[in-house]
Structure formats: structure tokens, C-alpha cells
Design a protein with these regions (language model features):
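N-terminal hydrophobic/helix-forming segments and targeting peptides
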Residues: 1-357
């Protein structure tokens, strides 16, 4: 019989981040988790005006290394309540509309959590042509069981956000499934690397671990965070598409696998010298990596950090992920651990005052 795959125990810090509800612009719960784990170990800690968390190690170190991963996630926001008490919504971030209906959701209100279900007209009540169409947002709603508008308004306000009610679960072996691995995994990686640097051999660099806000609606947190941190070099950690499923053309998207290791980006948004250092650090640490080519600004915080102030040499590390921007994203926890190890190795490789050019 084949040997049963053993599941690694998920880090408690990661699970707490995933349990935190933090749609873009409403990241309070995720900020609280970061502060709980990281603030006690930081030489300095602050939250900027857009809600990004900055933890600093080595106040007088040089160069300044910024590690960035975003704590916000996709969500919904209530825009209208009809006379029957049904809630209409817009999306926070880039949703696949085919995935919205029939989901359990949690609405985050001032009074607490309100449970709901996303609904639309049943397929039995559609014409043949309508069945082939993707519903528009205004053709879907959230049902909270209210009898009318008055009752709904007593529980929910216009502008309240909502998230899919999907929790972290082990899948098989080292694979796991959750909503918002994009990019709670990246936020976990940069902060866990920070904690290991604080606990072990200190780097000569000043390290600023930034849990950025509002990435999903235009890398807004990274824009202000890069100005505040003023780094000499930056590493951005975000999820990247694993293409090891049945419907991915490797000729278009490249070949990337869960369990294949961190994905390092080459292209205009990634500084060549930073890429080479990451690659060398991976070789030395015996970390398998995958290489991605992207000729344009990426859909990550790197697109903002790279052009902050007078420009920042930036590297991009991807965590392979299946089913991005759905309620059930899948990663390999071993890839995540290797991203943390690579961040630590890069930080410790820096020489005093080193510049990348």
C-alpha cells in the first residue's frame, strides 16, 4: 500500500490571520493579529494612516530592507436594501461573478457579525438563454432572513462589508484550502521571517516588515508604506498562479506546481540584482525555486514599491496557489515554509550599507 502523506501542522499565526475578516479598507481584525504576534518583538511598531502595519528590527541597521505582504482580502459591500429586506452589494476587489451565488457570507457590522447567503434566481426559473449568462451583480442579493427593510436596517447598514464564510482546512498531505490565502500567506511569511530574524542571528540591515492594506483595490497601502519605510531594497511576497491543474496552457502561463517551491519573478518589475541574490540564497539554503517571467508591472505591491520616491530595487516571491480569487484557494504549506526560509536567508545575506544597482 502507498505510504500515507502526513499533514504538517499549520502555524497558529497563519490560521489566526486566515480567521481574521479583513476586506480591503476594513482590515482591523488582521491588524490585531499582526500586532499580537509581532509588536512585542519589534524595536519599533506603527500603523500608518492607510492601515498598514510597520514592524522594525535594527533601528540603526543599513541597508533598509522592506518585506511586504498584504493583509486585505476580497469582499462585498452593501449598497442597497430593498423593501423585502434583501441586501444588494458591490464587490471589493476582483471577483469571478460565477462564484458568488449560493455562498454563506458573514457581514461585519458595528453590532457584530450577521450571517447571510448570497442568492439569485434558481436555474429552474430561467429561460434557456438566461441559463448561459453570468448574472450581473444587481441580479444577486444577500438573504439575512429579514422579514422587511425595517428589520434588515436594524441589523445591517449601507456600507457594511462582507466576506465569504469559508474556513481553513487541511486538504491532503501538505496541501490546505482556505479563503484569502491571497494574501494572508504573504503577510504571514514576511512577519514570520521578521520573528525568526528577531529571535536568531540578527542581520546588519534594518528590516521593516510591512503588512500592507488595500492591495486588492489598487496597491494603495504599498504606495504609502513604501514612502514611509523609505527602503534601499524591498521584497514583496504574494500568491502566484499554480498551473498544475487540467485547464492551464503552459505555453501561455508557464509551468508552476504546488510543492515546487517559491516562484521568483524576472521582468521589468523585478530588479535583476535582487533576483540573482534571491536565486543564490535559495541555492545556498537548498530551497527549490521556480522562475516566472513577467514583462510588465505585476499585480502585486511591487508595482507601487518599485517606483516609490527615487525608485526601489525590488524582488518578487510568489507562493504557488490554485483557484485564485475564489472562496477555496489551495496551497502547499511546504512552499510557504520555504518562502519564510528564503526571506530570512536574503536578509542575512545583506552586507552593511549594501546597495543594489
Amino acid at each position: 500500500m502507498p505510504k500515507e502523506s502526513v499533514s504538517p501542522k499549520p502555524p497558529a499565526f497563519l490560521v489566526e490571520l486566515l480567521e481574521a475578516r479583513s476586506p480591503s479598507g476594513f482590515e482591523d481584525e488582521a491588524r490585531a493579529v499582526v500586532a499580537k504576534h509581532v509588536k512585542p518583538k519589534a524595536n519599533a511598531y506603527e500603523v500608518d494612516a492607510l492601515g498598514s502595519c510597520h514592524a522594525t528590527l535594527g533601528l540603526n541597521g543599513s541597508p533598509t530592507l522592506m518585506l511586504a505582504g498584504h493583509i486585505d482580502e476580497l469582499g462585498l459591500i452593501i449598497i442597497h436594501i430593498d423593501d423585502k429586506g434583501f441586501l444588494y452589494f458591490d464587490v471589493i476587489g476582483g471577483h469571478d461573478r460565477t462564484m458568488i451565488s449560493g455562498r454563506r457570507v458573514s457581514i461585519l457590522t458595528k453590532k457584530g457579525e450577521v450571517k447571510g447567503v448570497t442568492g439569485k434566481r434558481a436555474i429552474h426559473l430561467m429561460s434557456a438563454s438566461d441559463r448561459r449568462k453570468v448574472p450581473e451583480l444587481h441580479q444577486m442579493w444577500i438573504d439575512i432572513g429579514a422579514k422587511d427593510k425595517k428589520e434588515a436596517l436594524s441589523r445591517v447598514r449601507i456600507g457594511d462589508p462582507a466576506i465569504y464564510d469559508h474556513a481553513f482546512e487541511p486538504l491532503h498531505g501538505s496541501l490546505a484550502v482556505a479563503r484569502a490565502f491571497d494574501d494572508k500567506t504573504g503577510a504571514y511569511a514576511v512577519n514570520e521571517a521578521f520573528l525568526r530574524l528577531a529571535k536568531g542571528r540578527k542581520p546588519v540591515a534594518k528590516v521593516v516588515a510591512v503588512s500592507t492594506s488595500q492591495e486588492e483595490i489598487g496597491v494603495r497601502g504599498a504606495t504609502t508604506s513604501a514612502y514611509l519605510a523609505d527602503p534601499d531594497v524591498a521584497l514583496v511576497v504574494d500568491v502566484s498562479h499554480a498551473t498544475d491543474h487540467p485547464d492551464a496552457d503552459h505555453r501561455k502561463y508557464g509551468a508552476f506546481t504546488l510543492g515546487g517551491g517559491p516562484i521568483l519573478t524576472r521582468g521589468a518589475n523585478a530588479h535583476p540584482a535582487v533576483f540573482e541574490r534571491l536565486y543564490d540564497c535559495a541555492l545556498e539554503a537548498k530551497i527549490s525555486v521556480q522562475i516566472e517571467a513577467d514583462p510588465r508591472p505585476t499585480g502585486t505591491d511591487a508595482r507601487a514599491i518599485q517606483v516609490a520616491r527615487a525608485g526601489v530595487p525590488t524582488g518578487i516571491i510568489g507562493i504557488p496557489l490554485r483557484y485564485m480569487h475564489t472562496p477555496s484557494e489551495v496551497i502547499d504549506l511546504n512552499d510557504l515554509e520555504n518562502v519564510v526560509r528564503l526571506l530570512v536567508a536574503f536578509a542575512r545575506s545583506l552586507k552593511k550599507g549594501e546597495k543594489f544597482s
